[in-house]
């Protein structure tokens, strides 16, 4: 019978030594994305420390790192120590997203706003609260662009929605990570409230520090997903791992994506990944 593959079947070894596996994986920490963001990060930090920006007139940047169009960064200073909470007002019942900024009471504020609607002038409320309980609120209007076609055309169906029984109804979103294209998140009524413009494959995990790990690729035209990115929901990249394309299995042909389907954080914050190691079999090595 004819093979259904378009490539020659290889005769890889059944088992490899640890040293050969490490050589095949060729894991490296790279800084391409971090380096490209340094100027923006410095700009936002300076804005948060500048007396030019206040709660009544803050610095606002939608999509601050160019990869998270339904997020925004709001920065300002206050004369007193305050804690800050934001609310993205929902379009339907119990879909408003409210979060309090980590860091407690301070005078310099960088507020990561997540959960905007696409192609909408969103209403966002920023509330500063003093230790004595005095509050001040600023209402912002943040305009976003339309969804990209691969998300816009995705079929999202909700039925029998009972928000009283759903954690999603308490300021949380459900992340949808498909075989390819952009990962996105929806609220209890199925509205898209976050997405990342980086293409992702199978793997997107929440880390204990609030960051997310996304298996992506250098650009949308690349064949393989061999960039593992530690990022946040605003799109800032904190660490990036690169892998070699030397691990295709016997039946894998040109498929040289290293990590497949799973990634887990350990208590010491190292992580384990399921990978193909270049042996006869695939997706069977941690």
Residue ranges: model-predicted function:
Residues 1-3:
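Gram-positive cell-envelope targeting signals
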Residues 5-7:
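N-terminal mature-domain "stem" immediately C-terminal to a signal peptide or N-terminal signal-anchor/transmembrane
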Residues 12-13, 20, 24-33, 37, ...:
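Histidine-/acidic-rich catalytic cores in large beta-rich domains
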Residues 35-55:
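Proline/serine/threonine-rich low-complexity linkers at boundaries of modular beta-sandwich domains
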Residues 48-69:
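Basic K/R-rich, polyanion-interacting modules in nucleoproteins and related proteins
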Residues 59, 96-99:
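A near-ubiquitous, low-amplitude feature marking generic local secondary-structure context
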Residues 83-97:
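Extracellular low-complexity, O-glycosylation-prone stalks/linkers
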Residues 99-107:
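Short beta-strand segments within Ig-like beta-sandwich modules, predominantly Fibronectin type-III
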């Amino acid at each position: 019978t004819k093979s259904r593959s378009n490539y020659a079947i290889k005769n890889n070894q059944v088992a490899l030594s640890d040293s050969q596996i490490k050589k095949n994986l060729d894991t490296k920490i790279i800084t391409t994305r971090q380096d490209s963001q340094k100027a923006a990060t410095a700009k936002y930090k300076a804005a948060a420390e500048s007396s030019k920006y206040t709660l009544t007139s803050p610095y606002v940047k939608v999509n601050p790192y160019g990869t998270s169009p339904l997020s925004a960064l709001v920065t300002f200073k206050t004369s007193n120590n305050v804690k800050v909470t934001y609310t993205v007002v929902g379009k339907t019942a119990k879909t408003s997203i409210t979060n309090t900024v980590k860091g407690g009471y301070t005078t310099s504020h960088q507020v990561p706003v997540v959960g905007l609607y696409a192609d909408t002038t969103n209403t966002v409320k920023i509330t500063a609260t003093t230790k004595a309980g005095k509050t001040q609120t600023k209402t912002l209007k943040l305009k976003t662009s339309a969804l990209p076609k691969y998300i816009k055309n995705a079929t999202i169906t909700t039925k029998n929605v009972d928000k009283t029984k759903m954690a999603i109804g308490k300021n949380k979103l459900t992340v949808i990570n498909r075989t390819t294209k952009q990962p996105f998140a929806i609220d209890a009524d199925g509205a898209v409230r976050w997405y990342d413009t980086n293409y992702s494959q199978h793997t997107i995990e929440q880390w204990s520090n609030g960051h997310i790990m996304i298996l992506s690729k250098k650009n949308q035209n690349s064949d393989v997903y061999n960039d593992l990115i530690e990022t946040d929901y605003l799109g800032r990249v904190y660490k990036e791992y690169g892998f070699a394309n030397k691990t295709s299995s016997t039946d894998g042909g040109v498929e040289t994506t290293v990590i497949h389907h799973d990634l887990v954080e350990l208590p010491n914050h190292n992580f384990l990944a399921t990978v193909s190691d270049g042996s006869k079999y695939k997706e069977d090595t941690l």
